Regions:
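Helicase motor core with emphasis on the C-terminal RecA-like subdomain
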Residues: 2-41, 45-48, 52-151, 155, ...
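Short Gly/Ser/Thr- and Asp/Glu-enriched loop/turn motifs at secondary-structure junctions
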Residues: 51-52, 541, 722
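Extended Lys/Arg-rich polyanion-binding regions
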Residues: 390-393, 399-417, 424, 429-446, ...
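Short cysteine clusters
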Residues: 718, 723-727
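Juxtamembrane regulatory segments of integral membrane proteins
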Residues: 726, 735-736
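Cys/His-rich metal-chelating microdomains
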Residues: 730
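Acidic, low-complexity intrinsically disordered tails
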Residues: 751-761
Length: 761
């Protein structure tokens, strides 16, 4: 499908065949009124995976449904849930069975409310979120049968106030965890502990609910769901929904000479290529949806596409629009209707709309930059051909090592199962606050500790020593006057979060983790919040406040950070010939020293500005590898070349780890040195950016052969001469991307991998 004159940008083209549906009958146990409501909306039968998941939930088995986009996952849990609600009612409609629905975003919970309301059933549905009034909350507690909320409200409101919710919690029959693949990293660890607290509080009120999890396709769904809930979970993962033929294209923008640091080439911006592709497709009357990472990017792509279309045919000049969060429901519905009717032929949308967007009949999807996981990639591509027709999916690579690797190694994207979620619910920095919250909800008993994992007893001792909990008789009690739930911000990596304040109004726009504020919310930073672009004026670390205002800036910023590291404890290691790979606990010292401004259109570096921010210390997990002097001698690398070779290997390995650990490159960091004092050898570290670790470095250790092999291949295959952002240059390097030795990095990694064996089957 390459446009005329640009076939050289297509790195891979693959055709996936169509798949027919496998149907199943409605179960006899289903409430006839619920079945009739679905039949009235054209659903005459189920797909096989819907029936299997619904039957498992009805039988009281905890189940995870892990299937593709548009495979009808909501019906699979709504059928048993709504049936239980209706058949469990007492006299005069008294609540007999309750359902709790958890979504990662408020918007998705509201979309779920709309979907249930459209069935026209007499089920009492309510949302419980930060916008709910006191009167609404009281009605929800006393009357609602199907409560839609999010993990944040469960943690801060419902669980601490569980005694006020006793009648509802005592009636709870089902807990639905939607979009479960989004719970990863530190957020996933927090949610895992919140769900354990929920199970404990439900038992206190006499309920033992069945958990039903819905997820995009992912590896080992029963393992991930079990780690999230602490329960034994049955997986339904065979997708029986129909799929049309899908053409997939991996697209790489061309290099532009001399626009980067030290004269390095940079690639044309993915957003510019995306606008060109939308134009090409719309001219051919192909209905197209483009996923773009930010609202600013969405608006830019839509505007540029219309400009290009106007040059081709003035009648096409307004056939592309933008679709992003923040629109009113009626605006969203109007845009959806315009796309369905054909008035609009193209739309640019933020990645967040992979959750809950209701647009069918699309012919093509263009993804501007790899969305971070194979699960998200397939979910976005799945938006095309949703009615079962044939479709086109295009991934446009951004200028970084991960995107570069994927378009040159298509099997890594298209030939592997999607990732399992990575998170560590036993992280003591996460577990501690939740043990405190649990003790305030109800004093902790010794026989309850296994619920919270193998480190609970150890962490409890630390909490007692810190004076936060007190052991009396056979239980642990919360001793502080504060609300224990306030100790944990479940979307934060640790420490008091920094509030983001709009300077002109004083309005709180959001928060950012204390750990990331230095690098993302410093003075002069361009900050993207829910897709909107803001310019930070000041960062006050004492008051934990960053003041910023909306911006139309045409540049982006990236912080430069200096890092040092020491090994606290080596937990595990493996010999790779004479080299070694290790995993353990480290102490990382970091200081943001400056930031770069880059053109948003071209990626060209505009300037660098120094910053005066304090050093931070972080105890976290890391993976590291060492190469002894005798092996280095055989590589032929001169001593003066070793720092640049190690530095280049470190940068690219950080860029590639997200392919194996479902993280963002900003969630991790690294250090490299030709001689580290703790090992006495050349050492390269990659560490988690969160206190206590988030599981990313450990995943790197477990998949090191594949991860570091991909690192080596990315550097070797890049067409630049000395290094560029697609291979070894890092946007956050505190040393100004010096020294870097591209050829030396390949030789160094060859020496390491020559002795390597797989660390995980």
């Amino acid at each position: 499908m390459a446009a005329p004159g640009r076939p050289e940008r297509v790195r891979h083209h693959r055709r996936l065949p169509a798949r027919p549906a496998t149907l199943a009958d409605w179960p006899k146990w289903a409430d006839p009124t619920v079945v009739a409501a679905y039949r009235s909306r054209g659903v005459d039968s189920l797909w096989e995976h819907q029936r299997r998941a619904a039957d498992a939930a009805r039988a009281g088995r905890h189940v995870v449904l892990s299937t593709g986009t548009a495979s009808g996952k909501s019906l699979a849990y709504l059928l048993p849930a709504l049936t239980a609600v209706r058949e469990g009612r007492g006299p005069r409609g008294r609540r007999g069975a309750g359902v709790l629905y958890l979504a990662p975003t408020k918007a998705l919970a509201h979309d779920q409310w709309t979907a249930i309301d459209a069935l026209g059933l007499d089920v009492r549905v309510a949302t419980h979120d930060g916008d709910s009034s006191p009167e609404q909350r009281e009605w929800t507690r006393d009357h609602a049968e199907y409560v839609l909320t999010n993990p944040d409200m469960l943690h801060r409101s419902l669980l601490p106030g569980h005694e006020r919710w006793s009648r509802y919690l005592g009636s709870l029959r089902f807990v639905v965890v939607d979009e479960a693949h989004h719970y990863r990293g530190v957020f996933g660890a927090h949610v895992a502990q919140v769900l354990r607290r929920l199970r404990r509080v439900c038992a206190l009120h006499g309920a033992d609910p069945t958990f039903v999890l819905a997820s995009a396709t992912m590896a080992d769904p029963e393992v991930a769901a079990g780690r999230l809930t602490g329960l034994e979970v049955t997986a339904v993962a065979e997708d029986a929904s129909p799929r049309g033929e899908l053409e997939l294209v991996l697209w790489e923008p061309p290099l532009i000479e001399g626009g980067g640091e030290h004269g390095a080439p940079v690639r044309r911006a993915a957003t510019a290529e995306t606008a060109d592709l939308i134009t090409d497709l719309v001219v051919e009357d192909v209905r197209t949806l483009a996923f773009v990472r930010s609202r600013r990017g969405v608006e830019t792509v839509a505007r540029r596409s219309n400009e290009l279309l106007g040059e081709v045919d003035p009648a096409l000049a307004r056939r592309v629009d933008s679709y992003r969060g923040g629109y009113l429901p009626e605006e969203r519905r109007a845009l959806e209707a315009d796309l369905r009717s054909g008035r609009l032929l193209g739309m640019a949308a933020t990645n967040a709309l992979e959750l809950g967007i209701d647009i069918a009949g699309l012919d093509a999807v263009v993804i501007s930059g790899y969305p971070g996981t194979r699960a998200a990639f397939w979910q976005q591509v799945g938006r095309a051909g949703r009615a079962g027709g044939s479709a086109i999916g295009v991934l446009v690579a951004r200028d970084d090592p991960l995107d570069t690797y994927l378009v040159h190694h298509p099997e890594a994207l298209l030939g592997r199962p999607v990732e399992g979620t990575v998170f560590d619910p036993d992280n003591p920095y996460v577990l501690g606050p939740h043990l405190c919250a649990a003790a305030q909800e109800k004093p902790l008993q010794p026989d309850e500790l296994d619920l919270f994992g193998p480190r609970a007893r150890e962490v409890l001792r630390d909490l007692v020593d810190a004076g936060l909990l007190r052991r009396r008789a056979a239980a642990w009690f919360w001793t502080d006057r504060r609300r224990a739930a306030d100790l944990a911000d479940i979307r934060s990596a640790g420490g008091r979060p920094v509030q983001l304040i709009e300077g002109s109004t004083g309005r709180v726009v959001g928060t950012v983790d204390a750990a990331r504020a230095h690098s993302t919310a410093h003075a002069g930073a361009i900050y993207l919040h829910r897709g909107e672009t803001w310019l930070v004026d000041t960062l006050d670390l004492d008051e934990h406040v960053a003041v910023m205002d909306p911006s139309e800036a045409t540049f982006t910023t990236s912080a430069r950070e200096l890092t040092d590291i020491r090994i606290v404890e080596e937990v595990e290691s493996v010999a790779w010939g004479e080299c070694r790979l290790a995993f353990g606990t480290t102490e990382v010292s970091q200081q943001v020293v400056s930031y770069l401004r880059r053109s948003a259109a071209t990626g060209e570096v505009l300037d660098e500005t120094p910053l005066d921010l304090p050093e931070r210390t972080l105890r976290t997990t890391a993976v590291w590898w060492t190469v002894p002097a005798e092996v280095l001698a055989r590589t032929g690398l001169a001593a003066a070349d070793l720092p640049g070779a190690a530095h280049a290997a470190e940068h690219c390995s950080i860029g590639l780890l997200p392919l194996f650990a479902t993280c963002d490159r900003w969630d991790i960091g690294g250090v490299s040195t030709a001689l580290h004092p703790d090992t006495g050898q050349l050492t390269v570290f990659v560490h988690d950016g969160h206190p206590g670790g988030a599981g990313f470095a450990e995943r790197g250790f477990r998949t090191a052969r594949d991860w570091l092999g991909a690192t080596r291949d990315t550097i070797a295959a890049c067409e630049c001469a000395q290094g560029c952002p697609s291979c070894i240059q890092s946007p956050k390097c505190g040393n100004g991307n010096e020294p870097l030795d591209k050829a030396g990095a390949v030789r160094l990694l060859d020496a390491l991998l020559g002795g390597g064996v797989r660390t995980e089957e």
